[in-house]
């Protein structure tokens, strides 16, 4: 049976907040000024302001959660592709980033 209501409250650790805020900043830099990505820019700006609050619990809207989850999934897939094509040193450097994003996806954003 499908749940009627989902909880969009998250308790991130300090490292997870840093990772998410750097991810949002990078995404905003890439999408800045393009009118096609107006909704994504608005959602990521809102997420970034919520991540910078000192409060422990962060409450996302459904739109923010779905956009963030989708972008993180795409990022994990892209990192995995780059790791498969690369040599040992690059693979070794990217492995920690891959594990951080995949753990974040598994722990907080698994449907």
Regions found by a protein language model. Name each.
Residues 1-111:
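Positively charged, low-complexity terminal tracts
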């Amino acid at each position: 049976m499908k749940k009627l209501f989902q909880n969009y409250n998250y308790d991130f650790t300090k490292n997870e907040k840093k990772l998410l805020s750097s991810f949002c900043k990078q995404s905003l830099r890439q999408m800045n000024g393009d009118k096609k990505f107006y909704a994504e820019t608005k959602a990521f700006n809102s997420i970034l302001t919520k991540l910078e609050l000192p409060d422990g619990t962060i409450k996302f809207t459904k739109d923010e959660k779905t956009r963030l989850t989708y972008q993180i999934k795409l990022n994990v897939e892209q990192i995995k592709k780059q790791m498969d094509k690369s040599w040992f040193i690059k693979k070794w450097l990217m492995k920690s980033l891959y594990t951080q994003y995949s753990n974040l996806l598994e722990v907080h954003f698994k449907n």
